Each structure stands twice: as C-alpha cells, then as structure tokens.
C-alpha cells in the first residue's frame, strides 16, 4: 500500500505532520521485510478476505511496526480507525504514512492526557457519532473500558476484543470477575509467540537502547535493580547484564524469584526482611543507596514508591517498562519535588522540595519518559522482527473472533462464550512457523510413528496446553 491521499480528499485524521508520510512509508517498506510472519499471513489470507466486513477500533502504539499491522488488517478486508495507547509512543512518521494512505488515525508523540482521551474518542466516533464497529484491538485496556463505560450500546454489535499486553489482560479478567465484561476477549499477551518474543526478547533489545539514548551514560560497572522477574523482567535483566551492569532483582513470586537466582542474579528486597510497612524505617537504605539505575517491569502499582525514591542514590536513573506510569510513584514526585526538563522525556527530579531549584544541585534523580514506557518514550520500542510475532497473533486473533460472530449469538450461547482466553495453540504454532521461515530455518517433521508415540498429530499442535515453554 503506497497510495498518498491529499488532505483535501481525506481529513479523517489528526497527526503531528502529514508531510512526514513519505519518510514513514520508506520505513514501513523496510519493516515489512523484517516481519515475515505478518507478511506471510497477508499473502496467505488475502484471497479469502477473512476480515471482510470487520470494522476494527484499534488502540495500540502507533509505530512503524503498527503501520504494517494496520495495513495487513486492511489487506485482509477490514476497515479500521486507530489511536495510540500511550502519549509518548507514537512515531509521527508512521502516523503520517497511515493517514496518507486514507486510514483514519489520531495520534502524535507528546500528547497531553486530555489529547490522549480525545484521540480515543475520535477513534470511536465518525462524524460525531459512534462508528458501527464490530471488533476491538486494544493494548492496555483503555479503549475497551471507555466503550464499556461511555458507549455501552456499541457492545451489542461487537464480536470481541483482542488484548496485547499484561496490564490490559489484568483489566479484562477483573472486569470478567465483576460481571462488567460484555464481550469475549482473546489474551494475545500470553500466546507463546507474543510473551516470549515481545515481553522477553523485545525488552532485552530495547531497554538498554532507550536508557542510553535518554542519558548517554555508560552502564557497565554500575548497579541496577530490576523490579519484577516475569517475562518483561527477565528480558530487562538480560538487557542490563549484557551492558556489563551489576544486576539485582526483586520479586514477590517465589517461582519467579527462584528463576532469577538460577539465572545468576542476586535476589534482594528494597525492604528490610522483605516487609513494606509503608514507612521509611522499612526501607533498606544501604541497598538503595548504591543503586545507579532502577527499572520497574511488573504491571503493578507503586512498586517503586515514595520511600524508595527518597532512599535512592543521588543522580540515579529511574525508569519503567511496564504499561502505565503508576509503577513509579510519579504523583509523589510531582507534588513534592521540582522537575527540570533536560530534553523531551528526560527530567531531573530535584529532591530539594517543590517549586524552584538550584541548577547546580546534585541531589536529583533522572526520570525517563515521565515514568511511562521507557523503550517507546526514549527510543523506538521493539524491533520489527520482535513485533512480527505479536502482530501476527493479533491478526489471527481478530480473524478467530470475527468468525465466531459473538454479537449474532443467542443469549444462552453468549453466556457460554463470554471468556478471556488465549489463542488456540495451533495458531500460535502457525505464527512461530512463519517466523522460523523468516530466519531461513527448517523445521523437522515427525514421522507418523513418532507422532503416534507421543500422542500428537504430524501437523501439531505438539505440546499440551499446560506446557511451559
């Protein structure tokens, strides 16, 4: 897709600068060559048009890789309207390229909170009225929640939502438990080809890149504390270790904690004996006073709280690679300490009190991306080859839900289908196979005898649902 439509012919968009479209198109073409699974699905299903009639509301980071996802959905028959799920994550050239192709998009880097909400509203609305959407593609859950709260009538026609990230899945499961979720959901985040690629290998690539772009610091020989050791934490710890940092990990889950130990990381707690009683007295000041860099990776709230921030070493770098900015207590920092912008998405946080500050003060923290996703705020996020698996999952999940036609079911059937589930393993394997082919790899086929011996078919799926990769 390379057509460029002039603003006079199409104005259902808002981006930073439409003149960046040619740049965005050049980068998109390169990204396509690095996304073999997504492009393979585009070729495989284009003739069948499995998304013909699908009207997809999308809210996911508006990057170059997302441009390839959007155009794949369109190539398979869908209509889409799009916004970004983070105020700092948009690549303006990518948004411009999508707008220039005649696809409604509302996103730019550096939105205010009010502009962010406006962009989501414009995604939902067409000509001032709710669009007759029948699918949602979300990252973090904001779009899904807004539709449930402000536009519940739209849910009568929506077949389901596909959710990209851990935080969004937590929100969906919470809504389901409370009886608030009205449409079925596919948990894309926990597909193997998403969680192992995006969450682990993607963070391994992009965290150190973002920190170095933001600070120009040498990382080797310095001490880092990674908060959380799920897939994102694992990738983050590896990212910092390969820079030569002395990496410590803190965890609440004994299994993840065990994995950190087995991977050779020192398991510590920022709290004395691991107990946080909410006071400064419970902080391990000796530990935090030596930390040069702290990164949160959990999807939880206040895992780097105000007392920890007070105890950190002077000039320590603080950042987050989880979805929302509430992993770090930025609200406390805004209320109690002075902020000095060094450059976009890099702030000195002077711990000398609110208001004015002495530029020569050396008691400050360096906060990246205002506590939001550092790899997209201070860099360009995961590379195309990583996002290939995530977005191929999104395409297959959209096809899967669209074919189920949940909105057309009888009430009794709807009650059965109202779930939050992962994509069937066979589809996960389909994504993995396309990715392997992109690397030039060759997968060995089982013989019939071998398949029978382990109780699978020659074509797969090859592992039971409970298998842990």
From Swiss-Prot:
Q: Does the keyword Hydrolase apply?
A: yes
The entry marks the following residues as binding substrate, namely 63, 139, 164, 194, 198
Taken from the record, one Pfam family name reads AdoHcyase
Tell me the route in metabolism or biology where this protein functions.
Answer: Amino-acid biosynthesis; L-homocysteine biosynthesis; L-homocysteine from S-adenosyl-L-homocysteine: step 1/1
The protein's Enzyme Commission number: 3.13.2.1
Instruction: Note the HAMAP family from the entry.
Output: AdoHcyase
Q: Which NCBIfam families match?
A: ahcY, PRK05476.2-3
Its protein name is Adenosylhomocysteinase
What is the organism of origin for this protein? Pseudomonas savastanoi pv. phaseolicola (strain 1448A / Race 6)
User: Mind giving the lineage of the organism this protein is from?
Assistant: Bacteria, Pseudomonadati, Pseudomonadota, Gammaproteobacteria, Pseudomonadales
